[in-house]
Curated annotation (Swiss-Prot):
A single GO BP: translation
Listed NCBIfam families: bL25_bact_ctc, PRK05618.1-2, PRK05618.1-5, PRK05943.1
Organism: Xylella fastidiosa (strain M12)
SUPFAM superfamilies listed in its UniProt record: Ribosomal protein L25-like
Protein name, per record: Large ribosomal subunit protein bL25
GO molecular function, one term: 5S rRNA binding
Chain's role: This is one of the proteins that binds to the 5S RNA in the ribosome where it forms part of the central protuberance.
HAMAP family for the chain: Ribosomal_bL25, Ribosomal_bL25_CTC
Assembly with partners or alone: Part of the 50S ribosomal subunit; part of the 5S rRNA/L5/L18/L25 subcomplex. Contacts the 5S rRNA. Binds to the 5S rRNA independently of L5 and L18.
Length: 207
């Protein structure tokens, strides 16, 4: 599991006015909650978070939150509020992580070997990814940044379901998996070719 460190400082002033001043200074108001400790208000460097939030790992990995240069606190991102039209993160929520408590996290799917699969090499075939992430349950030490889905054997007309995915050791789906809930993940089918537009009325009639 990769180590992703985020620097933070404790926040003394709270409220809308204080948050507005922080944003003007290039900082983001944030909070840490959960576990057996009280919530802690913190502030983050906007540039660091703006760059981090462009990566998958920021949403699905355990983050090492370094507050005031002290020991890192293990957290998960639980909410990130963006400005509706400006490139601005408004607020961030982190949840504390306990090493012996299972997590429920949405983990991205990475599809490999699609281009070299029978369906990928066939002409006139459309391959659609119905899901791009799955909700999994696991201990923090077992949390993967992503799960690979091998499409090397994908054929035209085939459907890959959740039950076909191989999950890492210690990782399982958060929801029940049965016939009714075994969702399609990848579908490979022939492209639909539309007929030419019908001839206009009277076209081709003899005069």
């Amino acid at each position: 599991m990769a180590n992703h460190q985020i620097k933070a400082q404790r926040r003394k002033d709270e409220g809308k006015g204080a948050s507005r001043r922080l944003r003007h200074a290039g900082m983001i108001p944030a909070i840490i909650y959960g576990g057996d400790q009280r919530p802690v208000s913190i502030q983050l460097n906007h540039e660091q978070i703006w760059l981090a939030q462009q990566n998958e790992w920021f949403y699905s990995s355990i983050l090492d939150l370094n507050v005031d240069g002290g020991g890192g606190e293990k957290v998960l991102l639980r909410d990130l509020q963006r400005h509706p039209y400006r490139q601005l993160v408004m607020h961030v929520d982190f949840q504390r992580v306990s090493s012996d408590a299972k997590l429920s996290v949405a983990v991205p799917l990475h599809f490999i070997n699609q281009a070299t699969s029978p369906a990928g090499k066939a002409g006139g075939v459309v391959i659609t990814h119905e899901l791009n992430e799955v909700q999994v349950s696991c201990l923090p030490k077992d949390l993967p940044e992503f799960i690979e889905v091998d499409l090397s054997t994908l054929n035209v007309g085939h459907v890959i379901h959740l039950s076909d995915i191989t999950f890492p050791i210690g990782v399982e789906l958060s929801t029940r998996l049965d016939k009714e809930h075994d969702m399609a993940v990848v579908i490979a089918k022939h492209a639909v070719i539309e007929d030419d537009a019908p001839a206009e009325e009277g076209e081709g009639d003899s005069k």
